[in-house]
Amino acid sequence: MKQLSNLFDMKKNSEKITMVTSYDYPSAKQAEAAEIDTILVGDSLGMTVLGYDSTVQVTLNDMIHHGKAVRRGAPNTFVVVDLPIGTVGISDEKDLENALRLYQETKANAVKAEGAHLISFITKASAMGIPVVSHLGLTPQSVGIMGYKMQGSTKEAAKQLISDAEAVQEAGAVMLVLEAVPSDLAALISERLDIPVIGIGAGKGTDGQVLVYHDMLNYGQEHRAKFVKQYGDFSNGIEALQQYHKEVREGDFPSEAYTYKKQILEELDK
């Protein structure tokens, strides 16, 4: 299994890290077969596979359910699972209880927490032996406040983002995800930090990149962000379903090629 130390070595050797956001067994199995370095089980599963309006409705049980499936599909890949909104920032006791449950039940390598306001949680979870990945910049759980826009785009905001990145590392974060940040700022933060920095919409100067499986394969997604490159196309699923519907209605499926041919009625008459 790929360990955290392998990811640190990759940063040290300037070898780019690949991360894919996956939510289920089949996609995780494909990611591992493709030798993707890390898998993120993001709370974006709420919109992508559960049909919610936002990540706000995603529960801890949702994350555990999907995290387990991903681990079964990718037993040898470094897996990070999101702590959904409402599971941290409550109290020290409850925060750690939720983090430990997610970490243990999914058999993840780390949990992810959004925002610099969770410094205390990162410190305490790390002390308990729970590796924490931090997420700064555009944080989906706060998008209702921030809006879907680039972060760190003013002098003051850039300084704050640098300070926050250094603070989460100091608190014990083992990795940082930077989302929707100016490329030069993301590169500077990656250079300053010792921990791996994974970018999404943050340019090529970070230590690695993350894209959502469904986005990069055009699988059920109506809109893609500017920073998403499409590497495949699963959008013809509707056409396939329409063809299936047509063939069944017209009696063309199943044909002989898809039918067990043993004749049993004669045996029943004996």
UniProtKB/Swiss-Prot annotation:
Keyword Magnesium (UniProt): yes
EC id: 2.1.2.11
Residues spanning the membrane: none
Principal subcellular localization: cytoplasm
Coiled coil: none
Enzyme class: transferase
Catalytic site positions: 179
Disulfide cysteine pairs (residue numbers): none
Cofactor: Mg(2+)
Keywords, comma-separated and alphabetical: Cytoplasm, Magnesium, Metal-binding, Pantothenate biosynthesis, Transferase
Keyword check for Magnesium: yes
CDD domains assigned: KPHMT-like
Location(s), subcellular: Cytoplasm
NCBIfam families given in the database record: panB, PRK00311.1
Self-association state and partner proteins as the record states: Homodecamer; pentamer of dimers.
Matches recorded under HAMAP family: PanB
Sequence similarity: Belongs to the PanB family.
PANTHER family assigned: 3-METHYL-2-OXOBUTANOATE HYDROXYMETHYLTRANSFERASE (PTHR20881:SF0)
Protein name: 3-methyl-2-oxobutanoate hydroxymethyltransferase
Gene field: panB
